[in-house]
């Protein structure tokens, strides 16, 4: 979990076995992000950046506007949650990144997304 003076980010990931094909080096994961506005003013998420690293150290960068097609406004004391997915070539990897946000005065700020693991459950004891 990462905290800023205004925003808290939590991420949980899960392996999607039914959509994965290990023989084809295709491992599918879903991740759910919860963004909490701990401040006293509304914020808006404008963009995202992800660094996805597979088990061989191969990195893929993904960036774009909003999340899952929206640029959510998050009121003070409220949270926004969404689920998305990632496909990597190995049974173990990581994701990390940041969100680009603005406050009610239009001041831009960046919130780091903590590193989290993408892992097939049978690999982790």
UniProtKB/Swiss-Prot annotation:
InterPro entries: ApaG_domain (IPR007474), ApaG_sf (IPR036767), Uncharacterised_ApaG (IPR023065). Residues 1-125 form the ApaG domain. GO terms for biological process: error-free translesion synthesis. PANTHER family: F-BOX ONLY PROTEIN 3 (PTHR14289), POLYMERASE DELTA-INTERACTING PROTEIN 2 (PTHR14289:SF16). PROSITE patterns: APAG. It comes from the Bacteria. Gene3D superfamilies: ApaG domain (2.60.40.1470). This is Protein ApaG. HAMAP family: ApaG (MF_00791).
């Amino acid at each position: 979990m990462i905290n800023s003076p205004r925003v808290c980010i939590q991420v949980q990931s899960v392996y999607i076995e039914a959509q994965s094909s290990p023989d084809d080096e295709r491992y599918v994961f879903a991740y759910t992000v919860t963004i909490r506005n701990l401040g006293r003013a509304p914020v808006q998420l404008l963009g995202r950046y992800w660094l996805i690293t597979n088990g061989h150290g191969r990195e893929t960068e993904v960036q774009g506007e909003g999340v899952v097609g929206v640029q959510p406004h998050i009121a003070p004391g409220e949270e926004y949650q969404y689920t998305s997915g990632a496909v990597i070539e190995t049974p173990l990897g990581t994701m990390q990144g940041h969100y680009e946000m603005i406050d009610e005065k239009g001041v831009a700020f960046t919130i780091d997304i903590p590193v989290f693991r993408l892992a097939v459950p049978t690999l982790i004891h």
